[in-house]
Amino acid sequence: MATHEHYYVPAQSKWPIIATVGMFVTVYGLATWFNDLKAARPESHGPLIFFIGGLLVAYMLFGWFGAVIKESRAGLYSPQLDRSFRWGMSWFIFSEVMFFVAFFGALFYVRHVSVPGLAGEGTKGLSHMLWPNFEYAWPLLNNPDPKLYPAPKEVISPWGLPLLNTVLLVSSSVTITIAHHALKKGHRGALKLWLAITVLLGCAFLGFQAEEYIHAYKELGLTLGSGVYGATFFMLTGFHGAHVTIGTIILFVMLMRILRGHFDNEHQFGFEAASWYWHFVDVVWIGLFIFVYVL
């Protein structure tokens, strides 16, 4: 006789609409902020709108995930729902992969198609008419129109902070894996220790990246206004930094849950999802280190 799994269907929730409004307000505030900066408006409501949107998103995350945690610990979830969570997280990471595929694609297009074309490769017509003295080299320290887009004085060496950050993130992948094995074996002390070390490594990475950005802006002249090189550099490293920030927050929440006695060797998907996300962030950074800093 066939057995049927129960499938928990929650009541109607306010969290999806709060998530939608929060994300809209956040993006609108950020766009307003950037536009006002470009227009040199002394007073801008963009930062305030962005902050309000961020608060709404934070409220939604704590409330929605808190409800999911309570339902899970109450035994309302079935193996079928666990599979749904795993598929959902897998597709979410896949969508994030596509983001970075697009950004890396933009970098490769700029390096191998558009900028070489401006320097005279291919038809040469456009470059001879507008920028006859422009020569292609990457990293781009000589923009076609230096008056409009001043090029950076120099680029960031990969063998300083970027290499250190690579060591930190690769080490954090090792520590989160050790923590995961400790969870499976029921070694709570080792689990707490190695997960805390992972969180600290993530915080250290973010601190060094902030130092790198300050150095780039103040001393190297490498900014968002430094032409296409600055734009692609900050787009890729900044978007990745946002993911490291999110991942570090997630790992910290996992640590707080573990300190409260959550998770065991059978019920641990929240921790597994966090570790999947962290490994994804680490792999992306290796690609960034190679293609943005080294090559």
Write out the residue ranges for each language-model feature.
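...captures the hydrophobic TM-helix bundle architecture rather than a specific catalytic motif
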Residues: 1-295
